[in-house]
From Swiss-Prot:
Its EC number is 2.7.4.8. It is an enzyme of class 2 (transferase). Transmembrane segments: none annotated. ATP binds at residues 19-26. PROSITE patterns: GUANYLATE_KINASE_1, GUANYLATE_KINASE_2. This is Guanylate kinase. The lineage of its organism: Bacteria, Pseudomonadati, Pseudomonadota, Alphaproteobacteria, Sphingomonadales. Residues 12-191 form the Guanylate kinase-like domain. It comes from Zymomonas mobilis subsp. mobilis (strain ATCC 31821 / ZM4 / CP4). Coiled coil: none annotated.
């Protein structure tokens, strides 16, 4: 009889969290990673300058533009996008390795990256979009970070409406008016998606064994 710790083999999933800047996707992603040891962050490649406190290979893989273009040309990226004068992309090899090992991969990316990822791996990709409760609250959060200039804040606000217009391309859409509640909802989505039948690749073998005639 299976023990309380019995688990079937399953295929990993690609779990995307997107939002306009300031709506909370990065904070939610950090909370999920800290509280769930079965999911791992996809570390993006970027051409943007490293910010204080960021670690190469942990927060991002920081590269120059020629290196990034070479990675695109050689199909080393699952998805990539040009955002605020910088390029961002997802290295293909580590993601595919984790997926085949049954490990989940978390993506903190925008709608362009989510769309490309879906086009390449629709059966493995789950997309969650985080909305702010209002544009006023979105601006308040951006200013509260204290990391962006007035010019950058205005650019982010101007881009927010365009980004939000793509909400209907996602599987789940949440309004982040309470961070703890929003994190709870995201964790619930993750739990449900993990136990869907198509992900339980060990079910066929298990049921065959379960239904096999008992040996004499």
């Amino acid at each position: 009889m299976p023990s309380a710790n019995f688990r079937l083999a399953r295929r990993g999933l690609l779990f995307v969290i997107s939002s306009p800047s300031g709506a909370g996707k990065s904070t939610i992603a950090r909370r999920i990673l800290a509280e769930d040891d079965e999911i791992h962050l996809s570390v993006s490649v970027t051409t943007r300058p490293k910010r204080p406190g960021e670690v190469d290979g942990v927060d991002y893989h920081f590269v120059d533009v020629p290196t990034f273009k070479k990675m695109v040309a050689e199909n080393q990226l699952l998805e990539w996008a040009h955002v605020f004068d910088n390029r961002y992309g997802t290295p293909r090899a580590p993601v595919e390795e984790m997926l085949h090992k049954g490990q989940d991969v978390l993506f903190d990316i925008d709608w362009q990256g989510a769309q490309q990822l879906w086009q390449q791996a629709s059966g493995d990709t789950i997309r969650v979009y985080i909305l702010p409760p209002s544009f006023e609250e979105l601006e308040r959060r951006l200013r509260g970070r204290g990391t962006d200039s007035e010019e950058v804040i205005q650019k982010r606000m101007a881009r927010a409406a365009s980004e939000i217009s793509h909400w209907d391309g996602y599987d789940y859409v949440l309004i982040n008016d309470d961070m703890d509640e929003c994190v709870k909802q995201v964790k619930n989505i993750l739990t449900v998606e993990r136990i869907k039948r198509r992900r339980q690749i060990g079910l066929i073998g298990f049921t065959r064994k379960l239904l096999a005639p008992p040996e004499d």
